[in-house]
């Protein structure tokens, strides 16, 4: 029966989406990955999320860019301090550094025109029905309840000076009986959740005159009373009901309730990186998962939506496509944010055109063809090729620290586009070496920090290295881009398990393995090392493969150098998987030497 169910799931993967919903009787907290929570991830953690266009990733945290680092193209905007800025990005960058200054409106500033949000009919200043005064409107207006969600409520509370966001969007407010409110004249609002002011959200007015109900909010304060045993502790100190964690909604206000998930509640979408996002963000034209799968296979999804006449609702479900006439009252600043994002520099990479620890060694692999692994290089020391390496762009090669010594850099050559030692091909290029950088904390006894950089010499009169037939592999910035059981590829000229020499470049597929302490107790360091192999040991790296690549492809077939062949024992034995240097742990170290623009993508 279990086998039949497994076959059914494999034939119809859509059935497996039910994993996002907790099974009956399953404890709600089981959806939260406790080990991940210890890292205190928030919406500013670039291991889990993309930074905004006015931010950059520094040591795992989205930090403020300086305004001059923003793209120059754009329309002027006005801030709450009455000062104009050349673009939305310039203002958001300034706000990032000075949070008290917020967006007011598009265009130039005028003394009398200011956006305003307020609450009325509440018992305290933390709650009430929401009113807004748009810049070009004469009167304050209410917001329609049917366009109001936790997303918009969070932004309203941020705007009102409550940094922990919303506590509830339901409330009993004290509307005097003699106050007649016309709920047919309310405004509709749509936010994305990245805004800090409601002024950045899009306001519209519908032609319908039916009553809508009015949006209200109760903002969160530190004295909110949530039972500790039945609540989720957000990184910012806020507490929310446990059942609201991993539901695709940013209830914490800092997104910490959605970044450490093993599954998602309701219709939320689970990224491979353990992040839950609202279902309506799937196939919306913008990548939200750092692993990219929310924008994969979207053509079929769009066809189905059009065929069914459905659109995504604010709550992540589906609703009929609206035909009601809508008047847009404010510019769509989210479209402007996406436009700014599109202007950021693009990176082209990853797409083809002796002790008891033995230095590692591809066993059981297949011969490679020209162009299969254009990032693979060989490092020649004197008259013999001793190690592999990975081209990562510019003049830089990534390899293992145990392969090279800084003092011997003049002895090394980098061979690119090499397929066979014995039959040099016409595409083969030989580069001299100008510098070797070994990680300062490399430990030759334990193989910790077994990583090094080799800088190739530039040809006379050239500003850059020109490797015509080479393509750089992308450098991963997050440890969550790939997961245990993902299938990846190793390549090299290492010996076979019978110690027979190999002269042609060979490759093989291996699976990433989780914590390998059970195979190498006391010698495996999870943060710095990655295990990979096959269940029968038929594919492995072997002596001579050291320094070479363990590469993995994402859903868009972009190749990342996930590991560097480092060490292991007993070539080709299933109980002794290969151990690789985990490259994602060294992104900042690599970028320090090679320059961030060479390896940075997605605004990292």
Curated annotation (Swiss-Prot):
Expressed in the liver by hepatocytes. Also present in other cells such as monocytes, fibroblasts or keratinocytes. Residues 218-262, 263-299 form the LDL-receptor class A domain. Its main location: secreted. The active site is at 402 (charge relay system), 450 (charge relay system), 546 (charge relay system). It is found in: Secreted, Extracellular space. This is Complement factor I. Keywords: Calcium, Cleavage on pair of basic residues, Complement pathway, Disulfide bond, Glycoprotein, Hydrolase, Immunity, Innate immunity, Metal-binding, Protease, Repeat, Secreted, Serine protease, Signal. The gene is Cfi. One of its GO terms (biological process) is complement activation, classical pathway. Residues 1-18 form the signal peptide. It catalyses: Inactivates complement subcomponents C3b, iC3b and C4b by proteolytic cleavage.
